[in-house]
């Protein structure tokens, strides 16, 4: 199996960047196309467990568009073959002082492009500087 083929990493990076832009601008149209429209798609959030595309879409539609801007760090995209990838990133928001967010996504290439099939978002206390 080929791991981290440069052209596949670039494709997933572009999809991840598209997600980030849509997330921080609350572009529901784009967000709704990124997650796989399937009842098996799962998103575990900071305060919610969403099972299936319909629950994810409803959550996004009901969420406040205020305070979504964030800064990402240590983003790692790893691809396995040409059709499977993970994207992991840390994030911080001005609205969450002292907290560090962590996000992991599982991406799969389908005939219509790359989609998230599973995601997990969590918060921890920001580590103290040594």
Q: Which sequence ranges carry the predicted segments?
A:
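Short, hydrophobic secondary-structure boundary micro-motifs
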Residues: 31-33, 43-44, 71-72, 117-118
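Hydrophobic alpha-helical segments typical of transmembrane helices
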Residues: 15, 27-30, 59-60, 73-74, ...
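Short, low-complexity N-terminal intrinsically disordered segments enriched in polar/charged residues
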Residues: 1-37, 126-130
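Short beta-strand edge/turn micro-motifs at domain boundaries
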Residues: 86, 100-129
């Amino acid at each position: 199996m080929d791991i981290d083929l440069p052209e596949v990493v670039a494709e997933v990076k572009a999809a991840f960047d598209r997600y980030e832009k849509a997330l921080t601008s609350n572009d529901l149209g784009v967000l709704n196309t990124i997650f796989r429209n399937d009842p098996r798609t799962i998103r575990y959030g900071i305060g919610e467990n969403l099972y299936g595309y319909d629950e994810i879409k409803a959550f996004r539609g009901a969420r406040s568009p205020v305070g979504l801007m964030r800064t990402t760090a240590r983003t790692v995209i790893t691809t396995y073959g040409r059709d499977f990838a993970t994207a992991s990133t840390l994030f911080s928001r001005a609205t969450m002082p002292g907290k560090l967010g962590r996000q992991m996504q599982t991406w799969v290439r389908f005939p219509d492009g790359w989609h998230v099939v599973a995601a997990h978002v969590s918060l921890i206390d920001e580590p103290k500087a040594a």
